[in-house]
């Protein structure tokens, strides 16, 4: 789920006035019903999204339901998937999904979602407390150089993309994964620059003998959410004091993104209708393109017919000239009957071609009329 989609779902969720971070079943069901999907599909979507089976939606569950609903409307899915796509499951919900799949008999999926314990460091006995989150200017330059070498064209880096730099740190693999999860709370495949710098700093601190904390400062964690969207209802307008320290500034601004949905009413009336209209427009564009191709084919055939008619007319004119010469020269020239037969044959061909050309013109006119009616 891309950040723009998630921001859109957040605006819808927030506009429905959740209580203590949860939407009641009636409010959530009202939004889903406005999609005009069949009742059996909506029931399956609800069963998938209500991960903790409490009859309510928190934001993560609401986003899952909305994403699957939109994908069904847009034709990404023909039917409701049997299980929640793994990419939509937040890190905090993976264990619940795994447990639910196990209870339903999907043990292979449960194993897929099983996350090993990363809290216990195999070298914990020799490690010390006092982990320092401060990144000095020199360290920031060093981390930035590493980031620049391994980021893609979008400015993002993946876990595997950074693998070549892990060995020099001498940090156990379980703790490398723990550091990755700390800077990547959303569990995405890639992270951005600020996350990468903090990730490298955590590995540096661990290689210097400091125990990796089990959490990051709240203000820093908030900056890790792509687009700097704060999904905490109680701190929607909170400020970030972390960047007032001499560490580093966020790469993107902190202005609250604007949504194209201003209120729940728009979800029911405008958003689903917009999707439906876009689908109809797409089908109409395809139909127009098909008709245009047919028109082009007819025009090509018509142009060929005109060329043939022109050539036959030249032959006819030539034969008429010969006939006239024959009449002028008397019986010494070619057989008059033979030339007369040639002329009759040419006239027949011209008549057939003329009728064919008129048919093509009529066909083009009909196609053009259909195109105008679709425009």
From Swiss-Prot:
GO terms for biological process: actin cytoskeleton organization; actin filament organization; endocytosis; endosomal transport. Residues 37-72, 171-206 form the EF-hand domain. Keywords: Actin-binding, Cell membrane, Coiled coil, Cytoplasm, Cytoskeleton, Endocytosis, Endosome, Membrane, Repeat. It is a peripheral membrane protein. Residues 272-375 form a coiled coil. GO terms for molecular function: actin binding; calcium ion binding. PROSITE patterns: EF_HAND_2 (PS50222), EH (PS50031). Its main location: membrane. GO terms for cellular component: actin cortical patch; cytoplasm; endosome membrane; plasma membrane. Component of the PAN1 actin cytoskeleton-regulatory complex required for the internalization of endosomes during actin-coupled endocytosis. The complex links the site of endocytosis to the cell membrane-associated actin cytoskeleton. Mediates uptake of external molecules and vacuolar degradation of plasma membrane proteins. Plays a role in the proper organization of the cell membrane-associated actin cytoskeleton and promotes its destabilization. Belongs to the END3 family. PANTHER family: ACTIN CYTOSKELETON-REGULATORY COMPLEX PROTEIN END3 (PTHR11216:SF74), EH DOMAIN (PTHR11216). This is Actin cytoskeleton-regulatory complex protein end3. It comes from Schizosaccharomyces pombe (strain 972 / ATCC 24843) (Fission yeast).
């Amino acid at each position: 789920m891309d950040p723009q989609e998630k921001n859109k779902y957040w605006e819808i969720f927030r506009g429905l006035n959740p209580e203590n971070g949860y939407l009641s079943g009636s409010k959530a069901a009202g939004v889903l019903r406005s999609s005009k999907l069949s009742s059996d599909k909506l029931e399956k979507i609800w069963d998938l999204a209500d991960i903790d089976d409490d009859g309510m939606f928190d934001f993560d569950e609401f986003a899952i339901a909305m994403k699957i609903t939109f994908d069904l409307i847009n034709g990404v899915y023909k039917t409701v998937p049997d299980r929640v796509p793994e990419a939509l499951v937040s890190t905090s919900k993976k264990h619940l999904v795994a447990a639910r799949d196990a209870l339903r008999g999907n043990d292979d999926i449960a194993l897929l979602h099983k996350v090993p314990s990363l809290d216990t460091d195999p070298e914990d006995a020799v490690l010390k407390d006092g982990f320092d989150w401060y990144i000095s200017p020199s360290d920031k330059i060093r981390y930035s150089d590493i980031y620049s070498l391994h980021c893609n064209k979008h400015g993002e880096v993946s876990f595997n993309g950074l693998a070549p730099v892990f060995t020099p740190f001498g940090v156990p693999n379980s703790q490398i994964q723990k550091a990755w999860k700390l800077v990547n709370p959303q569990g995405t495949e890639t992270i951005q620059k600020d996350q990468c710098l903090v990730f490298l700093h955590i590995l540096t601190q661990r290689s210097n003998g400091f125990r990796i904390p089990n959490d990051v400062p709240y203000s820093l964690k908030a900056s890790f959410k792509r687009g700097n969207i704060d999904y905490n209802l109680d701190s929607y307008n909170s400020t970030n004091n972390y960047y007032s320290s001499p560490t580093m500034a966020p790469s993107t601004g902190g202005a609250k993104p604007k949504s194209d949905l201003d209120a729940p009413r728009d979800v029911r009336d405008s958003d689903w209708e917009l999707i439906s209209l876009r689908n109809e427009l797409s089908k109409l564009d395809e139909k127009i393109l098909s008709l245009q191709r047919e028109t082009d084919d007819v025009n090509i055939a018509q142009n060929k017919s005109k060329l043939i008619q022109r050539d036959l007319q030249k032959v006819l004119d030539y034969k008429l000239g010969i006939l006239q010469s024959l009449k002028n020269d008397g019986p010494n020239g070619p057989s008059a009957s033979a030339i007369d037969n040639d002329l009759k044959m040419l006239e027949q061909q011209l008549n057939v071609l003329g009728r064919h050309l008129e048919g093509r013109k009529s066909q083009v006119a009909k196609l053009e009329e259909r195109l105008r009616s679709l425009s």
